[in-house]
Amino acid sequence: MTRHLKACTAKKDSAATASNKRRTRQTGIFHLVIEGRFQSAYWLHLNIRSDSMLRDLDHFLRAIWLECCGHMSAFRIEEKTYLSQLFQDTSFGWGPERQEYKMDTKLGKVLRPGMKFFYEYDFGTTTELSLRVLSYREGQMEERIRLMARNEPPPIVCEKCGAKADLVCAECIWAKGAWLCKRCAKNHEHDEMLLPVVNSPRVGQCGYTG
């Protein structure tokens, strides 16, 4: 997938440069791969401009994969933490030994090719992501973030009958019998906790419905 996307990107860049040479300025572009930190079946390939802020990436991840109740979030890049909202009490979260900053920081100032960093959404029922900077290039891109590829929904079967799972119980998700088809879900004891099976590493958590 990575090799294919690099080849396609090179072709598009060449075509864009030829047709838009006088209209669009060159900008730095990072190629990011984002995965569920403990659920690698869920992944995204993105192109993102280096003049974008961490907040832009935060908003994108919330929109495509995560947002349910307006929870807080954070990027962890090397020894620094970038929070969607800073706390007055610096002993919260990672403790006073970790430097905390706002997300109004440009990617070009904190990322470099080969770097791996992390993201967390919701500090209660936390969804964790790992991010890798595959490459950096100069090119033309009008939008700040471009989705290049994402995973197909992983096959998940009903734990009762083996059919395709449609629902997951947020109460039972770390136990047996959480993944259910619609028919088997009718007899589940926690029917009020059932959530739709969606293509996201946040599936089955908090109130996330996709």
Per-range role (PLM):
Residues 1-210:
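Short linear regulatory motifs enriched in tryptophan with gly/pro/ser
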